């Protein structure tokens, strides 16, 4: 990894520094952690710690890259024993989940990487996706393997977060079987749905305006809008109450008239972002009754929203590290309604009969990882037509659409 080596005693000290840093980063987050805190836990002077790492970010990067290298080695070592593509993907997912389960604190720290070092996050997922690409390219056109690999990553992304972290439960065989059935078969039980593109629809982002009818509430609206812009641009930790007051053109005292502290502002902002997403999605899906049409339209709505209002999604992601309950509430509220609608589709014989809650988190995860890949990791903030169709075909028909000689059809 390019880091210098030390004597046996030095390596032991370095390991203590790393373990201390994991504990501090986990408890406080990157921005609220310091070299002083880390050194204090180990019982070292600051100057001694700097013999091992240049600064806090260097230490953080080391922890994440070490996690990455060990995960990739473990997956690759276990894949060597299999040739069948279905078995390889199953082993990939099982090993990924087991490794995260064994290293929960580090994985929790890693998820903050997109706010600490976006390149670190991009590199990690590119390397993980490359393993899947190597599995898929034996059977699938190179035009689609990258986007499909990210779709597979998304299929288990929120499963890990919901069950291992938010609910602290096991991801049992039934859940893994549900993930695999979705990955290979998609959601379309009838198998005859043909994805189609929808034009982008206008959305001004002010669907919540009716909630601010009184003059006092309009002041609150201004504060929330200003906070949203600042949190989205600078991040929560780098935004101060005084800046919110200045941009809102109100006094600091007025801010505290409506909110006890900055964290309360964040909670309110996340609540309105949640409603905005649902309102915007409804513009696309309101005229459909077939769940497959709704999914086809809903995913495109999410991609358009990500493209135009990606800063809002960034706020939601960051909120989980500032106030866990707020971030978890956002996703669980979406998943709860999603699960109910998917259950209705299953009962009608339209949607594949698997665990609807698992399916809801898999679908949310696909949207998340594709959104991150196309609008956060890339500089241009666009997703091409072929990629959209590949994602939609994957959602509807799974990898089998591509594995049995099928094409990424565009209708």
PLM-predicted stretches and their roles:
Residues 61-67, 110, 266-273:
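Alpha-helical DNA-contacting segments of helix-turn-helix folds
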Residues 62, 76-102, 148, 268, ...:
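Hydrophobic alpha-helical connector segments
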Residues 94-122, 161, 303-325, 370-376:
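Amphipathic alpha-helical segments used for helix-helix packing
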Residues 16, 20, 24-58, 62, ...:
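Helix-turn-helix
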Residues 116-140, 146-147, 324-348, 357-361, ...:
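Amphipathic alpha-helical packing segments from all-alpha helical-bundle domains
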Residues 51, 57, 77, 110-111, ...:
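A cross-kingdom feature marking solvent-exposed beta-strand/loop segments within repeated
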Residues 87, 137-154, 170-177, 293, ...:
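All-alpha amphipathic helical-bundle segments outside canonical DNA-binding/catalytic cores
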């Amino acid at each position: 990894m390019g880091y210098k080596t030390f004597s046996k005693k030095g390596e032991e000290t370095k390991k203590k520094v790393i373990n201390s840093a994991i504990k501090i980063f986990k408890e406080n987050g990157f921005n609220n952690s310091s070299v002083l805190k880390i050194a204090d836990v180990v019982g070292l002077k600051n100057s001694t710690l700097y013999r091992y790492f240049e600064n806090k970010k260097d230490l953080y990067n080391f922890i994440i890259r070490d996690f990455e290298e060990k995960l990739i080695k473990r997956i690759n070592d276990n894949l060597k024993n299999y040739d069948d593509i279905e078995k390889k993907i199953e082993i990939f997912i099982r090993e990924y989940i087991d490794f995260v389960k064994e290293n929960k604190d580090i994985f929790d720290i890693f998820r903050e990487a997109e706010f600490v070092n976006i390149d670190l996050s991009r590199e990690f997922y590119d390397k993980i996706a490359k393993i899947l690409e190597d599995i898929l390219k034996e059977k699938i056109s190179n035009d689609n393997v990258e986007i499909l690999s990210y779709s597979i990553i998304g299929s288990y992304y929120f499963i890990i977060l919901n069950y291992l972290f938010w609910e602290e439960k096991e991801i049992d065989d039934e859940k893994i079987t549900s993930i695999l059935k979705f990955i290979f078969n998609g959601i379309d039980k009838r198998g005859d749905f043909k994805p189609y593109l929808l034009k982008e629809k206008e959305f001004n982002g002010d669907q919540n305006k009716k909630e601010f009818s009184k003059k006092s509430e309009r002041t609150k609206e201004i504060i929330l809008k200003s906070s949203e812009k600042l949190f989205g641009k600078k991040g929560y930790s780098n935004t101060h109450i005084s800046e919110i007051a200045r941009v809102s053109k109100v006094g600091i005292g007025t801010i505290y008239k409506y909110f006890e502290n900055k964290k309360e502002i964040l909670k309110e902002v996340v609540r309105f972002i949640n409603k905005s997403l649902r309102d915007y999605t409804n513009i696309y899906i309101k005229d459909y009754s077939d769940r497959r049409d709704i999914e086809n339209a809903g995913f495109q709505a999410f991609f358009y929203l990500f493209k135009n209002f990606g800063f809002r999604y960034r706020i939601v992601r960051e909120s989980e590290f500032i106030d866990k309950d707020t971030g978890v509430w956002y996703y669980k509220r979406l998943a709860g309604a999603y699960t109910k609608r998917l259950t209705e589709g299953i009962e009608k014989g339209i949607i594949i009969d698997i665990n609807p809650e698992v399916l809801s988190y898999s679908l949310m995860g696909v949207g998340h990882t594709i959104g991150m890949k196309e609008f956060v990791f890339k500089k241009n903030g666009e997703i091409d037509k072929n990629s959209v169709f590949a994602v939609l075909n994957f959602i509807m028909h799974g990898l089998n659409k591509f594995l049995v000689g099928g094409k990424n059809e565009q209708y």
